[in-house]
Amino acid sequence: MKSILVVTVCAALALFAPSAQAQERPVQTFKSSAGPIKITPVYHASLEIEAGGKVIVVDPAKPAVFTGLPQADLILITDIHGDHLDPSLIAAESKAGTEIIAPPAVVKTVTTASPISNGEKKTWGAWTIEAVPMYNLTRGPEAGKLYHDKGRGNGYILTYGGTRIYLSGDTENIPEMRALKNIDVAFVCMNLPYTMTPEEAADAVKAFHPKVVIPYHYGKSDLSAFEKGVAGTGIEVRVLDWYPKG
């Protein structure tokens, strides 16, 4: 009987304990005039932002696992590709009243989403959401085609309590990114052949000079090359694990 009781108790504890992955997530916290902003890397391009009692989920896509994290008040999507959206995860991370904001190209598939295009702004509660360009300059699957056409997907600048957070989406070293101003935290992609090299990403980051830069969507890129490229600029580089095992 004692052994059965022990097994039962252990099973119950395991059921209610957060997963190892949830416990080990490298959560980042940033200050704003409206209170702290907590950002949780989930996987690849998927992340969760919490501030003021509200939750924003960005690019919910498999194999991201949101176990132990709250469901979204807002889901923000950057592009049509499968590493940026998955209908089953969008449903799983939604609750009553969840809003979805996405580029018009995504709205064709995610029909409950509200569209936002490059250059447009929306106010969502205490947040300002600005859609900015993300696209390829030269890289594509074949001559005359690009992986990401200009205007199809969105990068985003999210502002809360005066703190400005940039999400690059899938992009190369484009003029619009280089011209960004007053970015506090930048999430910048890099991986070939779809976006850019670490060296190109570093060159872009040096141009708009955020206070903090966090590489994401990096796959097997050499992050040391990115760090080397940004060294000596005064920009803080935070290298996080976006590809947890298990």
Describe the residue ranges of each PLM region:
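Active-site environment of divalent metal-dependent phosphoester hydrolases
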Residues: 64-66, 81-85, 107-110, 120-123, ...
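Binuclear metal-ion centers of metallo-dependent hydrolases, dominated by the metallo-beta-lactamase
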Residues: 114-125, 150, 202, 206-246
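Sec/Tat signal peptide C-region and signal peptidase I cleavage site
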Residues: 18-22
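Bacterial N-terminal signal peptides
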Residues: 6-16
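Core dinuclear metal-dependent hydrolase active-site scaffold
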Residues: 23-70, 115-181, 240-246
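Proline-aspartate-enriched helix->loop->beta-strand connector
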Residues: 183-188, 192-215
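Active-site metal-binding motif and surrounding structural segment of the metallo-beta-lactamase
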Residues: 61-109, 181-187
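Positively charged n-region of N-terminal signal peptides that target proteins for export
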Residues: 1-4
